[in-house]
Amino acid sequence: MKILLATTNEGKVRELRQLLKDLDIEILSLKDMDKKLEVEEDKETFLENAIKKATSYAKFYKLPVIAEDSGLEVDALNGLPGIYSARFFDIEFGKEVLKEIPENLSKDEKNNLKLLRLLENQTNRKARYKTALVFYNFDYGIWTEGVCEGQIAYKPEGNQGFGYDPIFIPEGYNKTMAQLTPEEKNKISHRGKAVSKLVEILKKVL
């Protein structure tokens, strides 16, 4: 059975392939598809965005789809970046801290730098990663969610993972997500928890 992962994010594809390895399926990503479809993530929650992506890509490619929307919620910023996590650097909120930005930074590095600058004088650094995962195959849909609690570090550390991993310290750890091995991360991450729930359900229905 072929299942399409509705993402072009190589980090997400890599993690999802590893987490789904126990299922007897062939995994494709959007980069494997000849025809291209852009689905705007314009909903107000991770779950709504994931549902929109799953149904839109399934109808377009005529394939079962696994879609995800995830992000980082920081208490001191009233839940931001939240659904804007992937494009946090570009939104209007917090633009005042974006002076003297080094050139040639990646998108992830820009997002991390903006967040660290906004929290510069903040002692409350509590945060959490959240994800909503949706499987849709025309006959039915399944959704699961995962949360990983933690806090924001004072500087980036580590070179594993992607996104906010270099500045996110999971609860119970004294190092960032980017300092964990992929196996360690998958055991505790928001994505790992959501996929584990989904795999258990899919084993019964596929």
UniProtKB/Swiss-Prot annotation:
GO molecular function, one term: ribonucleoside triphosphate phosphatase activity
Catalytic activity reported: XTP + H2O = XMP + diphosphate + H(+); dITP + H2O = dIMP + diphosphate + H(+); ITP + H2O = IMP + diphosphate + H(+)
GO annotation (BP), single: nucleotide metabolic process
Class of enzymatic activity (EC top level): hydrolase
One Pfam entry name: Ham1p_like
A cellular component annotation (GO) from this entry: cytosol
Free-text cofactor note: Binds 1 Mg(2+) ion per subunit.
Keyword annotations from UniProtKB, A to Z: Hydrolase, Magnesium, Metal-binding, Nucleotide metabolism, Nucleotide-binding
Binding site for substrate: T7, T8, N9, E10, G11, K12, S70, F162, G163, Y164, D165, K185, H190, R191
Active site (record annotation): D69 (proton acceptor)
E.C. no: 3.6.1.66
Record: residues binding Mg(2+): E40, D69
InterPro entries: dITP/XTP_pyrophosphatase, ITPase-like_fam, RdgB/HAM1
Cofactor needs: Mg(2+)
Entry similarity comment: Belongs to the HAM1 NTPase family.
HAMAP family from the UniProt entry: Non_canon_purine_NTPase
Subunit text: Homodimer.
Function: Pyrophosphatase that catalyzes the hydrolysis of nucleoside triphosphates to their monophosphate derivatives, with a high preference for the non-canonical purine nucleotides XTP (xanthosine triphosphate), dITP (deoxyinosine triphosphate) and ITP. Seems to function as a house-cleaning enzyme that removes non-canonical purine nucleotides from the nucleotide pool, thus preventing their incorporation into DNA/RNA and avoiding chromosomal lesions.
Protein name: dITP/XTP pyrophosphatase
Gene source species: Sulfurihydrogenibium sp. (strain YO3AOP1)
Upper classification of the organism: Bacteria, Pseudomonadati, Aquificota, Aquificia, Aquificales
